[in-house]
């Protein structure tokens, strides 16, 4: 039986997607090991077992590949945390889920986290503060904190300061995990800390 044109197109698209995924994976691994400055397109292609021409066929330049690495790690985080966040019954539960789940994510996917951290920390890399995925994550965190305040679950505090504090604590958690530390009791202690820091005082 002959392969129909539509089937041929589907096969080609699958192969193309699989090759891009392979190249992104190899880029993640190499950047995690040596940092973005030393992760040249030649070295990434060598790791994937292909020529540099194959890499540049799938990605117009190194910047596009690096951006795809960043996007891939955020997508992984969304896949890991998204269902849990969606199931949270309140802003308080969502905050604690985000904090605890993030620490678990760091432990479950150390290579991806190392790659993203190396990209953000490189002087010529992608600045985290201006990246749209980071900005969106922080905006969602801020929205959850404001919702908690409006519903009376959280006390009055500066949301921007609290967001920055949560992010800083999670950055420290990532360093803890990367250094060989365990998820617990670190995650639960962070949850307790921010639960106390945000919870509205109870009336008499």
Tell me what each language-model feature is:
Residues 37-38, 153-157:
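Short, charged helix-capping/linker segments at alpha-helix termini
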Residues 59, 118-124:
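Short helix-capping/turn signature of helix-turn-helix
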Residues 22, 30-64, 68:
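Helix-turn-helix
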Residues 84, 116-120, 177-180:
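Secondary-structure edge/capping motif, primarily at the C-terminal ends of alpha-helices
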Residues 19-28, 44, 65, 69-73, ...:
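Generic hydrophobic, amphipathic alpha-helix propensity
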Residues 75-78, 82-83, 108, 114-115, ...:
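Amphipathic alpha-helical packing segments from all-alpha helical-bundle domains
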Residues 1-7, 89, 104, 108, ...:
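C-terminal peripheral helix-coil segments that are non-catalytic and often amphipathic
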Residues 68, 79-108, 162-166, 187:
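Hydrophobic alpha-helical connector segments
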